[in-house]
Amino acid sequence: MAYFLEQTDSEIFELIFEEYKRQNEHLEMIASENYTFPSVMEAMGSILTNKYAEGYPNKRYYGGCEVVDKIESLAIERAKKLFNCQFANVQAHSGSQANNAVYHALLKPYDKILGMDLSCGGHLTHGAKVSLTGKHYQSFSYGVNLDGYIDYEEVLKIAQSVKPEIIVCGFSAYPREIDFKKFREIADEVGALLLGDIAHVAGLVVANEHAHPFPHCHVVSSTTHKTLRGPRGGLILTNDEEIAAKIDKAIFPGTQGGPLMHAIAAKAVGFKENLKPEFKAYAKLVKSNMQVLAKALKEKNHKLVSGGTSNHLLLMDFLDKPYSGKDADIALGNAGITVNKNTIPGETRSPFVTSGIRIGSAALSARGMGAKEFEIIGNKISDILNDINNVSLQLHVKEELKAMANQFPVYHQPIF
C-alpha cells in the first residue's frame, strides 16, 4: 500500500513503521494504554481535521458546520446511551482537560479539593501540588490503609476536617474497585459535590464489570481510550442539567477553543464499538486475564499492593527488594514486556525511581490473549525479576515472547 507520508516525509514514516513493529512484537502492559479500533483511526485521519467548529451543535460561531453538528450530536447521544446518563460533553481534548473543566465549572479559585494521594494511586489532576489543580485550588488528599485498600472511615474523617467543595473518587493506579455509594455518603455528609474519575475503568463500567458511578456521582469524567479502546480524548457526563450547562461553558469558552472534530467523530465510532455485545466479552476477558496474572505472580511469592486486583491493573511492591521500580521497568523492557515504574503506598524512593511497577491487561486482551498466555507472561515476569541483572536471560525471554506476540498481530498496516 502506498502512503503520501512515505513520499513526503520518509523520516517520520520510517519512525511510525518502527513503532508499528514495536507494538506488534512487544507485550504492551502499561495499564493506561490500549490498541484502538482501526475504524477509530480512520475517523481520526479523516478530512474532519480541517473543520473549525467553535461552540456546540446548532450554536456555532463558524459557518459550514451542518455536517459536524450531526457528528457531534451522534457522539453525544451514543455517550449518553453507553453510560446511561442524561448529559454528555464530548469536546474535552483529554482526561486532564475534562477534570480541569469540571473544577473550572464548579469551583472558585482556592476552593478545596479532596482527592486520592498521588503515591496511593491518585492522578495529578486530583490535587497534586505540582499540577494546576494543586496550585489553583486548596488540595487535600486521602490514601489507603496498610492493606492497600481505601479506608472509607478515614476518608470521612478527613472530609469532615477539610470540608471540601468537591471530592474526587478515581485513580490512575489503584487495583481495587471504587465504592461510589460510600463516597456519595461521605460527600453528602460534608456538603461536597462528588466527581467520579473513571478514566481507567470506563470500559469495565459500561460492560458491567465494575460498579457504575451513577446515580452516586454528581459529575463523571473519563478518557475515551484506556479500557474503552477509543481515541485519545476526554469525556464529561452528568444527570444534572444545571451542572451540564456549567460544564459546557467551562469547556468552551472557559478552557478550550475549537473542538477537534476528527477526534469527536472517532469518539462516536468508539462508542458504537463499546455498545456491541462483543465489547462486554472483551471487558470480561480483561478482568479474568488480570486475575490469572496476579495468581501466577503470587504463586511465585511476589508481593502485590492490596494482595491482588479487582480490575484491569495490578501493582507490584518492591519496598523490601534491592531493586527499584525503575530497575524492573528496564529489565522487563529488555525482555519485550512494556510496563511502567510506579509509586506505591509507603513509597521510600523518588518518583523517578519508585518501589513498584504498574501492569495492565487491557492491551494484550485486545490482541486476543487469554489465560494461557497470561500465565506464561506471569512466569516470565517472575523469572526476569528473580534474576534482574541477567541480560542474556532478558534477551532469551524477549525472543520467546516475540514469537508469542506474532501469533496475536495487532494491525496489518501502520497507518489507517
From Swiss-Prot:
GO molecular function terms attached to this record: glycine hydroxymethyltransferase activity; pyridoxal phosphate binding
Cofactor: pyridoxal 5'-phosphate
Keyword Secreted assigned: no
GO cellular component term of the entry, any: cytosol
Residues the record lists as N6-(pyridoxal phosphate)lysine modifications: K226
Binding site for (6S)-5,6,7,8-tetrahydrofolate: L118, G122, H123, L124, E242, S350, P351, F352
Source species, domain of life: Bacteria
Enzyme Commission identifier(s): 2.1.2.1
Subunit structure of this chain's protein: Homodimer.
HAMAP family cross-referenced by the UniProt entry: SHMT
Listed name of the protein: Serine hydroxymethyltransferase
Taxonomy of the source species: Bacteria, Pseudomonadati, Campylobacterota, Epsilonproteobacteria, Campylobacterales
GN (gene name): glyA
